[in-house]
């Protein structure tokens, strides 16, 4: 009779491979999302701005419990599944015909995804649960020191790379939505992540030697082209469409437009203010603005992909002139350029964790920081920009023309190396808000103007979730005191200057 009470359609256990692919999608979904309740990094970095609901464009991250949703997505949906996948695969007995290295490769790849995810948590919050995290029997985990977590992640990363062997297999094609089980690609990903971590901690005095080793060891083995990009391609049908498509197209909403900050940087121009549009008695920069005819200096070739040509702000010239909204202000959707169709309207548009362009910028940074990887800063700067332009659909000719502009050329562009690399990296990281934010914190470039009605300076971390403050109060208090206060202005340990 007991057999009659067993639901044969309810699996007793889930294969580790299924949990891994689920965790991959959850991670990429969170990093790619434009949902204002969980991911507002594009708004913080003034790549986009809001039309009507302007709280987040003015740096209010508390009202919608954004930190909680970011925290939950990474801990509950990503790390928990990765940990369970690791345990199941590790404990699965091999058949006599199976290659043990295939299993080792799977475990190492899971480790790489875990390390990436924890680095995002540390870079967002600082001290976070780590050594006691993911234990269902411990509802009050301690928060580990952020620097100590990074040191352990570095050790784990080196071990994972040592354990990968591209002469053996790993996940099947349908169990790995990023590299389809290609171990050689995962080795490049691991080294590219290692390079990123090395650059991230390069200004921390106690980690300077470690940073140099990370960079020098990884540099020969990182991404070599856009074919190596760590990207997840979505499907054309729900529920596996790109979350941007869900938020911008399926929803029918008109919540976001490009921000004037990035528009004006990619297409410099002069403005004039003709009317007192906000009726405050004066005509100034708070009013609606018009592009001075013929004042455009140059146009970044990526603009036709980043933005829609629904609005020509200067019909007097042949080239389309784009117009961005004021960060933090109310911006009427029809009056401004829109998000590009490739991004907003393609349900299968891929989302990226790390790409070749970013890696090339990191190598340029390494050289400027005095670390002797092979090449020059200018060469890697040019490679990074070219890779970005080609990725979006531009041509080599367009890239060369752009790089020869006085304002863009590495030898003639204004500012020091941080300004040159930081500004161009910010442009190349368009639509990748978190990565852009992290780079901006390290390089302090470009200089972002204050939004219309800011509640703070530009946030350099998320505050801890309110639920943590309530339910895990002692650990929360210890962490807040340790980092110097639970504020959006408290720097992460590596954010030195």
List where the protein language model places each region.
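Membrane-proximal, proline-rich intrinsically disordered regions
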Residues: 1-58, 62-65, 92-97, 446-448, ...
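Conserved, well-structured interaction surfaces
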Residues: 51-131, 135-151, 155-170, 346-349, ...
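Internal, well-ordered domain-core segments that constitute the primary functional module
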Residues: 151-153, 158-225
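Hydrophobic-face positions in mid-chain alpha helices that act as interaction patches
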Residues: 208-363, 368-369, 374-424, 428, ...
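C-terminal functional modules
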Residues: 386-497
């Amino acid at each position: 009779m007991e057999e009659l009470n067993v639901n044969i359609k309810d699996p007793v256990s889930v294969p580790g491979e299924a949990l891994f692919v689920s965790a991959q999608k959850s991670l990429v979904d969170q990093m790619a999302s434009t949902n204002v309740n969980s991911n507002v990094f594009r708004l913080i970095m003034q790549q986009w701005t809001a039309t009507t609901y302007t709280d987040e464009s003015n740096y209010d991250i508390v009202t919608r419990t954004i930190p909680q949703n970011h925290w939950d997505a990474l801990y509950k949906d990503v790390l928990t599944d990765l940990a369970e996948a690791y345990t199941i695969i590790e404990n699965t007995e091999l058949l006599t015909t199976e290659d043990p290295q295939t299993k080792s490769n799977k475990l190492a790849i899971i480790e790489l995804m875990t390390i990436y995810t924890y680095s995002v948590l540390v870079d967002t919050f600082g001290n976070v649960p780590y050594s006691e995290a993911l234990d269902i029997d411990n509802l009050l985990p301690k928060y580990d020191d952020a620097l100590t977590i990074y040191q352990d992640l570095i050790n784990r990363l080196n071990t994972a790379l040592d354990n990968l062997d591209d002469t053996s297999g790993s996940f099947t094609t349908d169990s790995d939505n990023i590299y389809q089980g290609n171990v050689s690609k995962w080795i490049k990903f691991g080294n590219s992540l290692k390079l990123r971590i090395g650059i991230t901690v390069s200004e921390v005095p106690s980690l300077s030697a470690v940073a140099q080793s990370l960079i020098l060891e990884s540099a020969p083995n990182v991404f070599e082209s856009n074919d190596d990009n760590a990207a997840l391609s979505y499907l054309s049908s729900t529920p596996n469409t790109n979350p941007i498509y869900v938020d911008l197209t399926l929803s029918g909403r008109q919540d976001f437009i490009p921000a004037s900050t990035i528009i004006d940087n990619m297409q410099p121009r002069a403005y004039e203010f003709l009317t007192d549009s906000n009726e405050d008695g004066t005509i100034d920069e708070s009013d609606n603005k018009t592009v001075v005819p013929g004042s455009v200096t140059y146009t970044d070739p990526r603009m036709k992909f980043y933005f829609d040509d629904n609005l020509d702000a200067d019909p007097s010239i042949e080239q389309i002139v784009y117009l961005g909204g004021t960060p933090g202000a109310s911006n009427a959707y029809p009056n401004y350029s829109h998000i590009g169709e490739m991004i907003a309207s393609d349900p299968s548009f891929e989302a990226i964790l790390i790409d070749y362009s970013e890696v090339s910028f990191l190598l340029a940074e390494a050289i400027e920081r005095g670390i002797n990887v092979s090449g020059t800063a200018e060469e890697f700067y040019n490679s990074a920009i070219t890779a970005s332009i080609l990725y979006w659909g531009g041509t080599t000719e367009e890239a060369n023309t752009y790089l020869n502009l006085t304002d863009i050329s590495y030898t003639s562009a204004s500012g020091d190396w941080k300004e040159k690399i930081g500004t161009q990296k910010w442009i190349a990281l368009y639509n990748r808000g978190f990565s852009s934010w992290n780079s901006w914190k390290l390089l302090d470039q470009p200089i972002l103007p204050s939004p219309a009605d800011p509640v703070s300076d530009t946030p350099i971390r998320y505050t801890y979730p309110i639920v943590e403050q309530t339910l895990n109060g002692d650990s929360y208090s210890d962490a807040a005191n340790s980092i110097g206060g639970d504020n959006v202005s408290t720097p992460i340990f590596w954010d030195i200057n």
